[in-house]
């Protein structure tokens, strides 16, 4: 009797588990031709947890689109145009005949430069913290000095409000999609990236992060795309003099970057190091005695400490044998705050970027409107590389490419900022419920004035997104 009772309980548990699994399984949804019925079927625990995990919005369902055949044709045009802006010669060959979009072959106008590239993405560094952009608090003395010796981009905009947005823009060169960043989405490996192009040229590609890279799926994303991962878990305690909940202090992160560059040089390999800082983030703590502001003094102290760390890194790099053969890029991932008088407040996406390579990049200012997604092809153009390109961005160093545009987004709204032939700055905003608005940007750079028409501009935005 006892045995029979146990068997009965076991059977009930198995059946209960099956029923529970079926209750959470989303496989029964989308079986009906009726969209309302499908929504009812999906409105359960499985869909709740699935939506929480993926955090995605269906672009086709919620946003205005163009027919797929038209999109493919127009995207192909943009890929070809992006390549045209990156080289002297374009050969359009069917390098991937099965793909919807054919890569455009970029053929460099000169011999390839096998230079190291160090891309330092600075946490939350809004342009208005820098003295070169008008700040009077002397928060960035080292970056301001470095800007005088660099190519300074004065009109660059972040694509989003989170670190993962900056990471996707600088790796894959893609405009932002509503919902979750590609970094956090499933099936995000083996993409066409800046790293994939450089690895084919024999580069070591490294993602170096001061925090634990499982946060926001960073390690999984970069590993799935062929990067070597170096994060906080890779850094011996004796080499980390200070850390907080977000990561090791920036000076120790950059010390590790120096070690990686030394090792790559010793191995005779060029390296692309994508470095992500953490110190300019709450709780805004950092080692004592570095700057004239105390730890926990808020954002200003954290900005000045990060400035100190980057300046010290550059000074140390100048004594290295690989310095003359290295391009250093300093850029923010996003701004410190996105709140403004508009849902998408354009000034709240304005970020600094400077390119420093005394032997290879002439100092100056680049004032054209630009996006983070323009940097992968720009970096490759500086290296004078020939490659099959799927990038939508443009080489910013070419003055003969007239199109000036940028992309910005929050979770649901995505914007396309464009300077027209008439010199006016207009802004297309795509929102859920297939809503599209076109604005002229007022003289203050933030106020948006509604305008009618401009269907050609709307089509441009729809193609990119």
Q: Model-predicted segments: where are they?
A:
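N-terminal secretory/membrane-targeting segments
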Residues: 1-115
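Solvent-exposed soluble domains appended to multi-pass membrane proteins
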Residues: 80-465
């Amino acid at each position: 009797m006892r045995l029979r009772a146990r068997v009965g309980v076991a059977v009930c548990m198995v059946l209960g588990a099956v029923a529970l699994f079926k209750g959470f399984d989303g496989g029964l949804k989308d079986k009906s031709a009726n969209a309302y019925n499908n929504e009812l079927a999906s409105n359960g625990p499985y869909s709740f947890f699935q939506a929480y995990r993926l955090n995605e919005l269906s672009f086709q369902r919620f946003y205005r689109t163009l027919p797929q055949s038209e999109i493919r044709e127009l995207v192909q045009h943009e890929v070809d145009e992006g390549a045209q802006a990156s080289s002297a010669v374009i050969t359009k060959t069917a390098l991937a005949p099965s793909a919807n979009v054919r890569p455009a072959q970029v053929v460099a106008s000169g011999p390839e430069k096998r230079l190291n590239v160090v891309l330092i993405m600075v946490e939350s560094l809004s342009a208005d913290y820098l003295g070169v952009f008008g700040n009077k608090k002397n928060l960035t003395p080292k970056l301001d000095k470095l800007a005088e010796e660099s190519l300074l981009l004065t009109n660059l905009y972040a694509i989003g409000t989170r670190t993962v947005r900056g990471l996707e823009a600088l790796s894959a060169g893609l405009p932002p999609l509503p919902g979750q960043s590609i970094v956090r989405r499933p099936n995000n490996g083996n993409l066409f990236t800046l790293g994939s192009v450089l690895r084919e040229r024999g580069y070591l590609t490294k993602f170096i992060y001061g925090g634990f890279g499982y946060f926001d799926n960073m390690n999984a994303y970069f590993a799935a795309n062929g990067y070597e991962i170096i994060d906080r878990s890779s850094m011996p305690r004796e080499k980390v003099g200070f850390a907080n909940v977000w990561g090791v202090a920036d000076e120790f992160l950059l010390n590790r970057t120096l070690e990686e560059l030394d090792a790559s040089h010793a191995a005779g390999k060029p390296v692309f190091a994508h470095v992500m800082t953490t110190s300019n983030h709450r709780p805004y703590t950092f080692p004592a005695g570095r700057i004239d502001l105390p730890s926990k003094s808020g954002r200003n102290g954290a900005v000045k400490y990060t400035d100190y760390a980057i300046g010290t890194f550059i000074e140390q790099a100048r004594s290295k044998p690989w310095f003359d053969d290295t391009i250093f890029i300093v850029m923010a991932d996003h701004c410190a705050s996105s709140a403004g008088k508009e849902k998408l407040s354009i000034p709240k996406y304005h970020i600094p970027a400077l390119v420093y390579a005394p032997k290879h990049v002439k100092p100056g200012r680049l004032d054209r409107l630009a996006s983070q997604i323009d940097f992968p092809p720009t970096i490759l153009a500086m290296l004078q590389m020939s490659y099959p390109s799927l990038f939508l961005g443009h080489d910013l160093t070419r003055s003969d490419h007239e199109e000036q545009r940028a992309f910005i987004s929050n979770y649901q709204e995505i914007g396309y900022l464009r300077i027209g032939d008439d010199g006016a700055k207009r802004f297309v905003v795509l929102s859920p419920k297939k809503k599209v608005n076109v604005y002229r940007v007022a003289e203050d750079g933030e106020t948006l004035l509604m305008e009618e028409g401009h269907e050609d501009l709307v089509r441009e935005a729809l193609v990119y997104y």
